Amino acid sequence: MNEQLVNRTMAFAGILQAIAQVQHLARHGELDNAELAASLNTILVTNPDNTADVYQDKIVLQKGYKLILNQLGDSSQKDVEITRYLVGVLALERKLVRSNSGLGMLAERINQVNRQLHHFAITDEQVIANLASIYSDIISNLGPKIQISGNPVCLQRPIIQQKIRALLLAAMRSAVLWRQLGGKRRHLVFARKAIVDTAKKSLTL
């Protein structure tokens, strides 16, 4: 397999994995802690030797690959909400990269979280609150806010709001990586088959 395409597809699976977790959390108000940790940990790997270093939990990433098959493949069951969130994340990623200080501020704030992890687990409420504030302070104001749909009772809970923002930050991290690996929105239209085929092969590895 083309290594660049494999890495790019891995990063794209990372975006979809985090977005699907946002959707699940907004609807049900709960998320498996290991799955949450898998996405949040990707934010903290800022200087990876290779793409696989970013996505340590390969089991959770399989959900991202399956979402690629569903969203870009021939399925008639495409999730319009997932697509809407994806479009929103990719639009904000463009604005982040084009902003003068966005990426630098992001790196600085992520370093602070890394120091916090000497004392807390990544799924600790204090760490999640910190990650959520990074999203609110640096990314959310760059463009139109992503409107999250779900159960109003769940969405009113501050901890759910914070987890959703932290997961959107994780989706943004994967979007930045996807773009760094040569990912372009037109690939999602004109290179769909290659992406789907790569996701299928990655699922069987």
UniProtKB/Swiss-Prot annotation:
Membrane topology, record value: Peripheral membrane protein
Cellular localization per UniProt: Cytoplasm; Cell inner membrane
Entry keyword annotation includes rRNA-binding: no
One Pfam family named in its UniProt record: DUF489
Keywords, in A-Z order: Cell inner membrane, Cell membrane, Cytoplasm, Membrane
Entry GO CC: cytoplasm; plasma membrane
Primary location recorded for the protein, binned into one broad class: cytoplasm
Cytoplasm recorded as keyword: yes
Similarity comment: family membership: Belongs to the HflD family.
Protein name: High frequency lysogenization protein HflD homolog
